[in-house]
Design a protein with these regions (language model features):
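Helix-enriched interaction subdomains in cytosolic or periplasmic regions
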Residues: 65-93
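Conserved acidic residues
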Residues: 113, 184-185, 233
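Gly/Ser/Thr-rich loops at beta-strand to alpha-helix junctions
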Residues: 118-126, 164, 191-195
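Glycine-rich phosphate/diphosphate-binding loop of Rossmann-like nucleotide-binding domains
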Residues: 120-153, 157
Length: 357
């Protein structure tokens, strides 16, 4: 049983059982980034144009260790998609990685595709799926009524809404449509939750394991995967929200780094020329010592990162203050992210579509 011991007074130890609390994240990379190695999990990293691509494979043994379904997870991490040039670079990598995951699942150029936009179109941080579909090329009706130029495949789109507005399980709607139109494979797009502030709106995850809509915010619905639909399901998502636990725990870690950096560079003449609010200490190499942590936070400062997160979770959750938070510019970012995903899918699915057209 996982226990965190918090010193209370001089001679009293208070034990808090935190095993029953689960930190919210949909990203596989969140669960492995702070661990040196986990049995049953293989990962490789590469960087192109300052964009990080992490390829993770989880087998059955690794699946039990981190409670993630076995399969392939590709994560693309970037800094800024509001700039056109950067957005085009991210889109190019997204297309290449999506083509790779389609190839790994033996999906051919002739296989038809149902693209599903999961989420609530009336909630800005949750509208990634429906908004991405606005950019997707639909061709099935063109195949029905006439010849289509070579280089395009049959594509359909579906926006099933959310159970709160339809009263129907999202997975059941998708399953019914799949049984009727019989696509070769499904691409499901959804907004995700992250365990890191740094990854919010700056990460795209692709996986061939399918998806549990709403799982990142504690509203888990029926699984949408090969197991339930009997065809390949590629899930694509971007973390658009974090919970209060993540914000508080990340702030504590940044506080440690800020203190250590300033302590070690107090006499550095360069820092005297830079306003304190403009100094990005995260770009510096910082060695945060246990002594630094204890000076700032006492006994809590000696806890591991995961222990701090779970302790904060226990403090906030019972009183209903573990809120889900999104950046104030989310509507602007959603426009850019949906462009990358929607038009990126067009490029990956249709040989005739490229960056120019």
């Amino acid at each position: 049983m996982f226990l965190v011991k918090i010193l209370m007074g001089d001679n009293m130890n208070h034990e808090i059982d935190l095993q029953k609390y689960q930190i919210r994240t949909d990203l596989a990379i969140d669960l492995i980034s702070n661990k040196e190695s986990i049995k049953g999990i293989k990962s490789s990293k590469k960087t192109i144009d300052n964009i990080k691509i992490t390829d993770v494979y989880i087998d059955d043994e690794g699946s039990k260790s981190i409670n993630k379904k076995s399969g392939n997870y590709i994560t693309i991490e970037f800094e800024d998609v509001t700039d056109y040039e950067n957005r085009q670079k991210v889109k190019k990598i997204f297309v290449n990685e999506l083509k790779q995951i389609l190839n790994n699942n033996n999906i051919t150029n002739d296989d038809s595709c149902l693209i599903v936009g999961l989420g609530n179109s009336n909630s800005t941080p949750d509208c990634l799926g429906p908004k991405s579909l606005e950019n997707v090329i639909v061709t099935n009706h063109l195949f029905v009524y006439g010849e289509v130029e070579k280089g395009f495949r049959k594509t359909f789109t579906l926006t099933p809404g959310v159970m709160g507005t339809t009263g129907i399980e999202t997975g059941e709607i998708i399953k019914s449509v799949v049984e009727t139109i019989k696509p070769g494979f499904v691409i499901a797009i959804d907004a995700l939750a992250s365990q890191s502030i740094e990854r919010v709106n700056k990460t795209i995850q692709m996986t061939d394991t399918g998806i549990h809509p709403g799982s990142g915010v504690g509203n888990s619905r029926k699984e949408i995967s090969r197991d339930t639909l009997n065809i390949p399901v590629i899930a694509i998502g971007v973390p658009t929200v974090v919970d209060a636990v993540t914000i508080v725990s990340d702030t504590i870690n940044y506080m440690f780094k800020h203190y250590s950096y300033n302590k070690n560079n107090i006499d550095n003449p360069i820092n005297k020329l830079i306003p304190s609010t403009s100094l990005n200490y995260l770009n510096k190499e910082i060695n945060v010592t246990e002594e630094d942590k204890k000076i700032l936070m006492g006994t809590i400062g000696t806890l591991e990162n995961e222990e701090i997160k779970q302790l904060i979770f226990e403090v906030l959750t019972p009183i209903g203050y573990n809120l889900m938070v999104t950046p104030k510019e989310i509507d602007f970012l959603m426009d850019k992210l949906s462009d990358i995903i929607g038009n990126g899918i067009n490029n990956a699915l249709h040989n005739k579509v490229n960056e120019i057209n």
